[in-house]
Curated annotation (Swiss-Prot):
The lineage of its organism: Eukaryota, Metazoa, Chordata, Craniata, Vertebrata. Its main location: membrane. The gene is NLGN4Y. It comes from Homo sapiens (Human). Belongs to the type-B carboxylesterase/lipase family. Residues 1-43 form the signal peptide. This is Neuroligin-4, Y-linked. Residues 359-364 are annotated as: Interaction with NRXN1. Homodimer. Interacts with NRXN1 in a calcium-dependent manner. Interaction with neurexins is mediated by heparan sulfate glycan modification on neurexin. Interacts through its C-terminus with DLG4/PSD-95 third PDZ domain.
Amino acid sequence: MLRPQGLLWLPLLFTSVCVMLNSNVLLWITALAIKFTLIDSQAQYPVVNTNYGKIQGLRTPLPSEILGPVEQYLGVPYASPPTGERRFQPPESPSSWTGIRNATQFSAVCPQHLDERFLLHDMLPIWFTTSLDTLMTYVQDQNEDCLYLNIYVPMEDDIHEQNSKKPVMVYIHGGSYMEGTGNMIDGSILASYGNVIVITINYRLGILGFLSTGDQAAKGNYGLLDQIQALRWIEENVGAFGGDPKRVTIFGSGAGASCVSLLTLSHYSEGLFQKAIIQSGTALSSWAVNYQPAKYTRILADKVGCNMLDTTDMVECLKNKNYKELIQQTITPATYHIAFGPVIDGDVIPDDPQILMEQGEFLNYDIMLGVNQGEGLKFVDGIVDNEDGVTPNDFDFSVSNFVDNLYGYPEGKDTLRETIKFMYTDWADKENPETRRKTLVALFTDHQWVAPAVATADLHAQYGSPTYFYAFYHHCQSEMKPSWADSAHGDEVPYVFGIPMIGPTELFSCNFSKNDVMLSAVVMTYWTNFAKTGDPNQPVPQDTKFIHTKPNRFEEVAWSKYNPKDQLYLHIGLKPRVRDHYRATKVAFWLELVPHLHNLNEIFQYVSTTTKVPPPDMTSFPYGTRRSPAKIWPTTKRPAITPANNPKHSKDPHKTGPEDTTVLIETKRDYSTELSVTIAVGASLLFLNILAFAALYYKKDKRRHETHRHPSPQRNTTNDITHIQNEEIMSLQMKQLEHDHECESLQAHDTLRLTCPPDYTLTLRRSPDDIPFMTPNTITMIPNTLMGMQPLHTFKTFSGGQNSTNLPHGHSTTRV
């Protein structure tokens, strides 16, 4: 059958229409696919516009079903490279860039010399010193151009937060100011679980970060200024990442914690953060501040051929040296101290940290701080040769070495040594070497960490500033640590960053259990709650039922605020509880008694009537024959320090002849240790009473003389106020010089020696050779708020504003 010719075009038209429709559909599908690809690409590689240019990060899923994905922005510059003429100078803002900067890989770390032979092992965590091969992978790319930070941004919204902006937590890594990098700590888990933005930073270390000549040639504290510059960058740019610049918390462990503590005392960091978490270290620790920077700078300059007399020429020579030559020099600091670290420059750190705390300079910040149960493990681990504990000789040697290096004055050293041994002997089990080992760990823990932390907490809480204290009692099972060890220095770090939730890593190679996962969730909840509200209990409740069926005992615990009277703290462990007065007796021993005991023999010179040394005491004791004191305490390598300008100490105590009327120090005693301690305490109280009586008598006599004076002409009150302020801010070094001068002038008059008592200030942290000395160019630590004074650092200036009269100190800018 034939089709009509008029209908022949219909199939052709239909075919054409189908082809056109298919083409359009194909194009539409292709465009849609491209669009979704671009969206997915943007989600996978997000781009953020900062004040200095655009950066592209990486969206990273985490290996746990309870953790959401995190955006990572790695190697973001926060300052210009501190190279060339910028070496030994404060940091400067970074340069802008065009286009999109790749921020998916870490940048170079700050120069450091990771040699196991020269590390300060006692001050570093075990996971750090036993993982040097792993750490080398993090620090192998070193460069002076190292001022970069890493940002971890969670993707999920917080149902407990109404504020769309997320709180920010900035981690300052530790490492005895000489080692470490922010790159080795992954903030992804903490950011995801706690729904906060976590930022880790690199800052200049060691010689490049803290070298100081003690004058204007090289002021020091460049590492601290790097941290402050990072905080300034965060304040300016964190909003682009969804962060709240008004809710910034800085936190750190070890040397990082002491940096955090120092930043709370510096005017340079005002307004850059609101809260601080101080883990195992404060500005009051003996190793927190370098009191003799010029000494170690001279040693370095001599080693590299830059030992010019003029400090400006010396620093210029050091600037021209290759950084590798500088950091590879071996400079050993005094035991329990540092060679290159923060210094009191009169500007960034305007005065001694204890004085600044007493003035209330850190009351603007909410603070959470604490210690681990066995911080002093590394000090003892090197002494013990096996698992059997500590022998009596090892114990005696450790105490003797400790006293010689921290309190190396000849006056009262024997009394102090015996008192410490008495305090740290478990008299119910004194023959047990394992008990002896435990008490020795406690000695170093209390002195280096606990006493400074409690003192810091007391000073911060005395005016009602929010303060929370914790004691960390848990540690993971690991072959890196001896089986007898408690929670050591740095053991809290993996729990803070949620490492148990993803399992062992090369850096934290522990056998994590469900209990470890639960405790890590608890710690992260406390830390991030504090960052959100300043209260570790709010807004997120403790709930870990999703981890295992065991009840979470932290649900029933309310972490109470710390105050100097009750001293409440949270025991963080598998059996949590709120307790009070953490190691109060030992803390009082170090803070109240020891500062008087270490110079006690000078007091004995006033009251003793002994004219010659008694014969050796061979009295029989239940545990053997009593030896002479010369054999009781093993000698150390540190030589005894002979007092200058005091001839009576140079006399031979065994010299025969006519009776010597010079009062001598009794070096051999026939009374027991208990009686020695009792007499020591009694003599201290007697000495203090004499001082108090003398002060009262002086005031009464002065008032009597003033009543007979004629009224003086009216004076210029403006000049008086200026004069009072100048006196008030006199530097610690100048005070020390005046004190020494007064004492020297009085040494010729024995009857007046009671009017010149030893200077007990800050004895917890000073070593014998750490007494500040003055040179023509020495910084005198005058705050830059004085009218007409120029700040020592040009990094940032502060106007001398009017202070509130309600503050604890006239120069304080903080709240009560």
